[in-house]
Amino acid sequence: MSFIDPRTYIPSNSTESQILKFTFIVCVPICVILIVLLVLYIMRRNSNTNVDWSSLGGFVPTNNNLSTAELGLSKDIREMLPIVIYKESFTVNDTQCSVCLGDYQAEEKLQQMPSCGHTFHMECIDLWLTSHTTCPLCRLSLIPKPSVDLSHQSIEIVSSIENTNGGEASTQPDSQSATEAIIHIDDVEEGNRDSIEVVKESEENDRNSVGTSDGCCSCRLGEKA
């Protein structure tokens, strides 16, 4: 029979309590750190999503603004589009609505695009133009282009006319100088011809004078002999 020394005996309850204390000491700081990191992550995510649109110079997009905003033509402009009544003998290029792909029926009211002449169902084109400003078939814009500044155009035309007049004035002396140069060249050529003729005449005169001088010398020699 064995006896346990009471001095070295450690009850089991004390070991379990020590294990629990150790686990608590280790796990609690880890949990606190995880909670703090989670809170910081949530705060940072919220700060990124809640952008101050007013500081960026824009507006805060809300569901009401997006639902009521019209990206296309206004209702007043849509109501001003010409309305035509479709007939079988009516000369239209389209016999089918390009929006709903439905055929036109006799005596049916259609709306016509003033820029291209294409026709559509009134309900279809009205729904289309609430979010678009172009014809659904040819994509031609229904918004008129801004008028051209006529004063700016007139200034450009006047400046171009002045430039052309200046160019003509500058070309006239050039043409005149060219004609003068041609005349001068012709005069020089005529002068050269005259000088050549004068040289020829002088050479003939020299030859004649030499011949006469030779004849005189021969006559004088004959007299002396």
Swiss-Prot record:
Annotated keywords: Membrane, Metal-binding, Transferase, Transmembrane, Transmembrane helix, Ubl conjugation pathway, Zinc, Zinc-finger
Keyword Zinc: yes
SMART domains from the UniProt entry: RING
Example of a GO cellular component annotation carried by this entry: membrane
Protein topology in the membrane: Single-pass membrane protein
Keyword Transferase among UniProt keywords: yes
Zn finger region (RING-type): 97-139
GO biological process, one term: protein ubiquitination
Pathway membership: Protein modification; protein ubiquitination
GO MF annotation, one: ubiquitin-protein transferase activity
Domain-level remarks: The RING-type zinc finger domain mediates binding to an E2 ubiquitin-conjugating enzyme.
Descriptive protein name: E3 ubiquitin-protein ligase ATL59
Naturally occurring in which organism (per UniProt): Arabidopsis thaliana
